[in-house]
Amino acid sequence: MRFEQPLEEGRLLRRYKRFLADIESAGGERLTIHCPNTGSMLNCMSEGCRVWFSRSNDPKRKLPGTWELSETPQGRLACVNTARANRLVEEALLAGDIAELAGFTALRREVAYGVENSRADFRLEYPTGALFIEVKSVTLGFDETAVAAFPDAVTLRGAKHLRELAALAREGIRAVQLYCVNLSGAEAVRPADEIDPAYGKALREAAQAGVEVLAYGAEVTTEGLHLARRLPVRL
């Protein structure tokens, strides 16, 4: 996935009201841009950190740009635009780059399922039946160990999705929790039990119920993203 237009570099001044960020561009222009991430962005929003943003030419937009990438304190690039994860996964699915999920005959997005009124990011159809996928974008890396973690904030919705997937698996339906690790240099991913122990517990219970837990790491550059390789998940 290449960015639709060249990204512009800047420095973060502050993030506020969840969806707003003030930045200073490389040319000294101060802008308020859209922050497309509802998480805490723990290692992605240090004051003064390097950021990259896409600028919109749409005169109807209230904000002139969207925050796309951050440089973490460890010098890694993280894609903070969570909407990119689903697009990246879909691109990889259609290209056959996720071997464990290859061979489907149809793909649908945002499919309702479950007793808790969830919507699966993807439903794949195979000759043997359906498969449901929940995608999570991972950008959190605590230190120099190259182990990414999810979530970066307490997520009741994430735990609900795991319960829904586990219920499917118990019925004999293939269910997949897929972590799209949008953090350069990541070598593995784990649940962030120190942030949300309930989520970690739900993930391990889902795996025991038969949910397939997969992680794929992206190559993150200022030109684009590519889902490059499978990463181990440390439960």
Curated annotation (Swiss-Prot):
Lineage: Bacteria, Pseudomonadati, Pseudomonadota, Gammaproteobacteria, Pseudomonadales
Gene Ontology molecular function, alphabetical: DNA binding
Listed InterPro entries: SfsA, SfsA_C, SfsA_N
Stated family: Belongs to the SfsA family.
Signal sequence interval, chain numbering: none
Name listed for the protein in its UniProt record: Sugar fermentation stimulation protein homolog
A Pfam family annotated for this UniProt entry: SfsA_N
